């Protein structure tokens, strides 16, 4: 398989969760004898990998939602999530990745109607629906 073909089948990273879930589901229709995954392992059945990835996204969403107390700001919610998950880093890169993932997951929860976003004098606050 050439570079052009590989690029066509490249999976998205956690940037837009609803789209990522749709793309993962669409991969079920591929009929290849084997698949090379991101970490250079190969599998012959893609279904279990797709199921595990979808389950992991939903699990992260549930864990993030469990940390939300109505009226929290994004910073408060992220802080509560990091405490719950035991994320104790001072590395700027890891912090930025955690913040990015939080923004995508919290945005997905808002889009899915599980969380409401309220704006009050330039401060955004979240609450469970």
What are these regions (language model features)?
Residues 1-61:
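Metallo-beta-lactamase
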Residues 63-129:
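C-terminal regulatory/interaction regions
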């Amino acid at each position: 398989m050439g570079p052009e073909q590989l690029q066509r089948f490249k999976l998205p990273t956690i940037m837009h969760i609803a789209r990522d879930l749709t793309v993962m589901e669409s991969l079920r229709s591929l009929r290849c004898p084997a698949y090379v995954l991101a970490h250079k392992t190969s599998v012959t059945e893609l279904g279990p990998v797709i199921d595990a990835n979808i389950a992991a996204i939903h699990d992260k969403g549930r864990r993030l939602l469990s940390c939300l107390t109505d009226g929290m700001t994004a910073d408060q919610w992220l802080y509560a999530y990091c405490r719950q998950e035991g994320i104790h880093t001072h590395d700027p890169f890891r912090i930025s990745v955690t913040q990015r993932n939080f923004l995508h997951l919290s945005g997905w929860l808002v889009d899915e109607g599980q969380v409401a976003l309220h704006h009050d004098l330039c401060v955004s606050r979240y609450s469970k629906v």
